Amino acid sequence: MQTLHALLRDIPAPDAEAMARAQQHIDGLLKPPGSLGRLETLAVQLAGMPGLNGTPQVGEKAVLVMCADHGVWDEGVAVSPKIVTAIQAANMTQGTTGVCVLAAQAGAKVHVIDVGIDAEPIPGVVDMRVARGCGNIAVGPAMSRSQAEALLLEVSRYTCDLAKRGVTLFGVGELGMANTTPAAAMVSVFTGSDAKEVVGIGANLPPSRIDNKVDVVRRAIAINQPNPRDGIDVLSKVGGFDLVGMTGVMLGAARCGLPVLLDGFLSYSAALAACQIAPAVRPYLIPSHFSAEKGARIALAHLSMEPYLHMAMRLGEGSGAALAMPIVEAACAMFHNMGELAASNIVLPEGNANAT
């Protein structure tokens, strides 16, 4: 059975030759070179992924939603009751939440995964529960390092199993009351930013309670002293089971040479962890939308990412990842279905990339 170390070691590098061939093909399509902008860049990125066999393509699509509760909820950093995590997870199994509707529209399947809900097991939810909620990061670590490593490996294997069954495009999502607090702590640690710069309102936290949330994040970092150069240390000390789970999806998809669509702020924090654990993950990540959460810009700048959509969304759940799946499919359609300049006897002058 593959270990986490072996999985990380075996993440393939992008195929530079396939990317060069894709760029050459795109430049010869029936349009001025570069005129489809980032759609062209996305197609080239996809072409370099070994799991797609050298060409932009999308088979089955899946959004993996990691559900967990957080001990830091006790610090008054969220307005919703903790039980909402379990209620919404059950709603997801019925297909009635935001991510389910958007995923269905995109033709993607939603996998609802319990990695730490503080409730009885929920029918229809995949059971990977580590515990009933993680520790309160304001007073100690979220979990042990061994728990984080075991969950990373389990989720990575689950992701790779889906790849073997035909999934070629993954999206990540999460569900957990109070989880923007550990996400903000992780972003603060990885980017070296003060908590005040990255703490936002989450799920409509009143402005009068923001200062407390900032203080909680600062305390969590001061008490746990996470090492920003050790992604697993950060996840285990100031993260949460849902954030570890999303990181595991990224590691697993990268191991299979397949793309992962990020969601919003929570997924940015997991992406920072994934890229710290294994920098080889970065070429497989695709930013979907620009989260409305306060620390989004700082996290994305650290990842050197510019999302494709600006929708003022902050729902989470993987909703942005599902919404962006048709953009990935559009890049593939452009690559395979457009005509070629050579076949149309059109010769464009150089420097005509901005023509319409």
Curated annotation (Swiss-Prot):
<comment type="subunit">
    <text>Homodimer.</text>
</comment>
<dbReference type="GO" id="GO:0008939">
    <property type="term" value="F:nicotinate-nucleotide-dimethylbenzimidazole phosphoribosyltransferase activity"/>
</dbReference>
<dbReference type="Pfam" id="PF02277">
    <property type="entry name" value="DBI_PRT"/>
</dbReference>
<dbReference type="InterPro" id="IPR003200">
    <property type="entry name" value="Nict_dMeBzImd_PRibTrfase"/>
</dbReference>
<comment type="pathway">
    <text>Nucleoside biosynthesis; alpha-ribazole biosynthesis; alpha-ribazole from 5,6-dimethylbenzimidazole: step 1/2.</text>
</comment>
<keyword id="KW-0808">Transferase</keyword>
<keyword id="KW-0328">Glycosyltransferase</keyword>
<feature type="active site" description="Proton acceptor">
    <location>
        <position position="317"/>
    </location>
</feature>
<dbReference type="InterPro" id="IPR017846">
    <property type="entry name" value="Nict_dMeBzImd_PRibTrfase_bact"/>
</dbReference>
<dbReference type="InterPro" id="IPR036087">
    <property type="entry name" value="Nict_dMeBzImd_PRibTrfase_sf"/>
</dbReference>
<dbReference type="InterPro" id="IPR023195">
    <property type="entry name" value="Nict_dMeBzImd_PRibTrfase_N"/>
</dbReference>
<dbReference type="GO" id="GO:0009236">
    <property type="term" value="P:cobalamin biosynthetic process"/>
</dbReference>
<comment type="similarity">
    <text>Belongs to the CobT family.</text>
</comment>
<keyword id="KW-0169">Cobalamin biosynthesis</keyword>
<protein>
    <recommendedName>
        <fullName>Nicotinate-nucleotide--dimethylbenzimidazole phosphoribosyltransferase</fullName>
        <ecNumber>2.4.2.21</ecNumber>
    </recommendedName>
</protein>
<comment type="function">
    <text>Catalyzes the synthesis of alpha-ribazole-5'-phosphate from nicotinate mononucleotide (NAMN) and 5,6-dimethylbenzimidazole (DMB).</text>
</comment>
